[in-house]
Amino acid sequence: IGAGVSGLLGFATVASADEAEHGLECPSYPWPHAGILSSYDHASIRRGHQVYQQVCASCHSMSLVSYRDLVGVAYTEEEVKAMAAEIEVEDGPNDEGEMFTRPGKLSDRFPQPYPNEAAARFANGGAYPPDLSLITKARHNGQNYVFALLTAYRDPPAGVSIREGLHYNPYFPGGAIAMPKMLNDGAVEYEDGVPATEAQMGKDVVSFLTWAAEPEMEERKLMGFKWIFVLSLALLQAAYYRRLRWSVLKSRKLVLDVVN
């Protein structure tokens, strides 16, 4: 019995050490766009973009997303043009060979919060905030991981010490993350009046980040459904010809009548 208890304790210790090193396994959440024929919740994408703008964009870039990508997905073209015009973009050179600034336009990418990586690390105590353009594809179990990470901040358990400047999060590898808790109830005021709870903001920003990483998902699913339909018709046609046309030829027998 003693050996069995020791073995269980040893296994528990190894499991705890592995969780501390790699982070807890994320639970699975019922994302509305995860079904085979499901599409994005575009109202959630719009709210998620609002969360990104007001909460995340001060530290995290989305260098692969342009303003025009939002047209028809979460905003009208006029809304996106007005949004892009609020930023200043360095352009040029002009006819005199000098750089100049201009209002943003639809073709511009989302602005960078820092001019370079060194500036980003200096502003964040040595930590480098990752680009969020593909974050839900760049992390294992991406959507579930990002949601769990954003909503799982808590006080460290007894016996666990966190270095100053870091914050305890059981889903982050090592359990200590430089990013503080950012989603607090009421942190943003949604335009559509939906209550901005921590869980709601986490769901919405993950929906937005998932769309940013896979903007073609709806088109891909629709194309897959069309191909399945066409191939099903082709299969039925092939089965018909095999059963009623080819089988006659296949079963036909030739008789050789030899005349003496």
Curated annotation (Swiss-Prot):
Q: Where in the cell is it found?
A: Mitochondrion inner membrane
Can you tell me which residues the record assigns to a coiled coil? none
One example of the protein's molecular function in GO is: metal ion binding
Q: What is the free-text note on the cofactor?
A: Binds 1 heme c group covalently per subunit.
EC number per UniProt:
7.1.1.8
Presequence boundaries: 1-17
Q: Which cofactor does it need?
A: heme c
GO cellular component assignments: mitochondrial inner membrane; respiratory chain complex III
Q: Which residues form the Cytochrome c domain?
A: 43-150
Q: Which Pfam families match?
A: Cytochrom_C1
| Tissues in which the UniProt entry reports expression | In all tissues analyzed.
Bilayer-spanning residue ranges = 222-241
Write down the InterPro entries for this protein, in alphabetical order. Cyt_c-like_dom, Cyt_c-like_dom_sf, Cyt_c1, Cyt_c1_TM_anchor_C
GO biological process assignments: mitochondrial electron transport, ubiquinol to cytochrome c
Q: Which residues face the membrane's Mitochondrial matrix side?
A: 242-260
Segments in the Mitochondrial intermembrane topological domain = 18-221
Q: Which domain of life is it from?
A: Eukaryota
Q: Does the keyword Lipid metabolism apply?
A: no
> What membrane topology is given?
Single-pass membrane protein
Residues where heme c binds: C56, C59, H60, M179
What the record says about family reads: Belongs to the cytochrome c family.
Describe its partners and assembly state.
Component of the ubiquinol-cytochrome c oxidoreductase (cytochrome b-c1 complex, complex III, CIII), a multisubunit enzyme composed of 3 respiratory subunits cytochrome b, cytochrome c1 and Rieske protein, 2 core protein subunits, and additional low-molecular weight protein subunits. The complex exists as an obligatory dimer and forms supercomplexes (SCs) in the inner mitochondrial membrane with cytochrome c oxidase (complex IV, CIV).
Functional description taken from the UniProt entry: Component of the ubiquinol-cytochrome c oxidoreductase, a multisubunit transmembrane complex that is part of the mitochondrial electron transport chain which drives oxidative phosphorylation.
- For this entry, the protein name equals Cytochrome c1-2, heme protein, mitochondrial
**Annotated gene:** CYCL
